[in-house]
Design a protein with these regions (language model features):
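Interdomain hinge/lid region at the active-site interface
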Residues: 248, 253-307
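Serine residues within intrinsically disordered or low-complexity segments
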Residues: 106-108
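NAD(P)-dependent dehydrogenase/reductase Rossmann-like domain
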Residues: 307-327
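Short, hydrophobic beta-strand segments that form beta-sheet elements in well-ordered domains
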Residues: 27-31, 128-131, 171-174
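NAD(P)+-binding Rossmann beta1-loop-alpha1 motif at the extreme N-terminus of oxidoreductases
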Residues: 1-53
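Internal alpha-helical scaffold of NAD(P)-dependent oxidoreductase catalytic cores
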Residues: 40, 143-149, 164-254
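Rossmann-like NAD(P)(H) cofactor-binding subdomain of soluble oxidoreductases
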Residues: 34, 38-39, 43-103, 112-164
Length: 327
């Protein structure tokens, strides 16, 4: 089975490298311009093609493009495909789409129940995945109407652009049964762990991923800003903090439940240290420190009720700060 990739950003390149390492034949890659396509093809060692050629030559195609580009790219690709197929099932949940010879109707647009057929696509149907975490399979409805099996294939990983390991990476899938089956097989071949996130849950799933990945960077940036006061520069501040972050990740890997990896003053019920923090933090850090502190109090597994209440009062600002008499 030849596999094609449209888009050569971090995810697209990681897909090509992972598929090649897994022994798949990557039949082509396409980008937004001939120059970008040629550069990516040379870097990855696969044929460069136009997007239409990738879909024509490959049985399975990944759209590794920005979320805003998924629908227009799908529509452009679909324009070159045969739209005469009578009916097929292309998704599940609210993104189910039924294509007919006379047009396309969506389950979210008031389709009559009698038309909610779940028929199997033809054996020679192409399979197209987008790689968005937040978007549903409805973004591919033009390709579905043209006879493709459609799904989403989102690696729960932040790719840095260089060689990337897919081992142990969870891959969130959605789509029709045949597309999900193909996605599961590909994920396992990459060494990844497939699981299903239905369309109605994609935004919440993506929010969880953003909290883990994106907001960790935000927190590290704020910590770096403080630490650089003593290390002499921002980069040195980050380097000073990285061993601490790596140790935290190692604790999380061993813990199983995230809360079990918690350390620090709140974990041990040390209100005195929390008071000291609140006394010296710059004003721009205060709301975030208090908010995260309250969430930490809620999850800290070793606190008793008295400690939990005392810490919550401190963080809510109901008690006096250090250097003043504590009521």
């Amino acid at each position: 089975m030849e596999i094609g990739v449209i888009g050569a950003g971090k995810v697209g390149k990681a897909l090509v490298r992972g598929l090649l390492d897994a022994g798949y034949d990557v039949g082509g890659i396409a980008c937004g311009s001939a120059g970008s396509t040629g550069k990516a093809a040379a870097e990855l060692g696969v044929p460069g093609m136009t997007p239409a050629e990738v879909l024509e030559h490959c049985g399975t195609v990944f759209l590794a493009v920005p979320d805003r580009s998924i629908r227009p790219v799908a529509e452009e690709l679909a324009a070159g495909l045969d739209t005469g197929r009578k009916r097929l099932d292309v998704g599940i949940g609210p993104d189910i789409v039924v294509a007919e010879a006379t047009g396309l109707e969506s389950g979210s647009g008031g389709m009559p129940e009698k038309k909610r057929d779940r028929l199997v696509p033809p054996e020679d149907a192409k399979t197209v995945f987008h790689c968005s975490g937040a978007a549903g399979t409805g973004e591919l409805e033009a390709l579905a109407a043209a006879g493709c099996r459609c799904g989403s294939f989102h690696p729960l990983q932040s790719f840095a652009g260089g060689p990337a390991s897919w081992q142990g990476v969870y891959v969130a899938l959605d789509g029709g049964p045949a597309a999900v089956e193909t996605g599961e097989a590909l994920a396992r071949a990459l060494g990844s762990v497939p699981f299903t996130v239905p369309a109605e849950d994609r935004a919440l799933y993506h929010a969880a991923a953003c909290v883990c990945s994106n907001y960790t960077v935000t927190l590290m940036t704020l910590a770096q800003k403080l630490m650089s006061r003593w290390t002499g520069s921002g980069p040195a501040g980050l380097q000073a903090l990285l061993p601490l972050l790596k140790g935290t990740v190692a604790n999380l890997e061993r813990a199983g439940e995230a809360a079990s990896a918690l350390t620090g003053p709140i974990a041990r019920g040390d209100g005195t240290t929390v008071e000291k923090h609140l006394a010296v933090l710059p004003p721009e850090f205060m709301a975030l420190y208090r908010g995260l502190g309250l969430e930490t109090v809620a999850i800290a597994p070793e606190l008793d009720d008295v400690q939990r209440k005392r810490l919550a009062l401190l963080l809510e600002g109901a008690e006096c700060l250090p250097l003043r008499k504590v009521q």
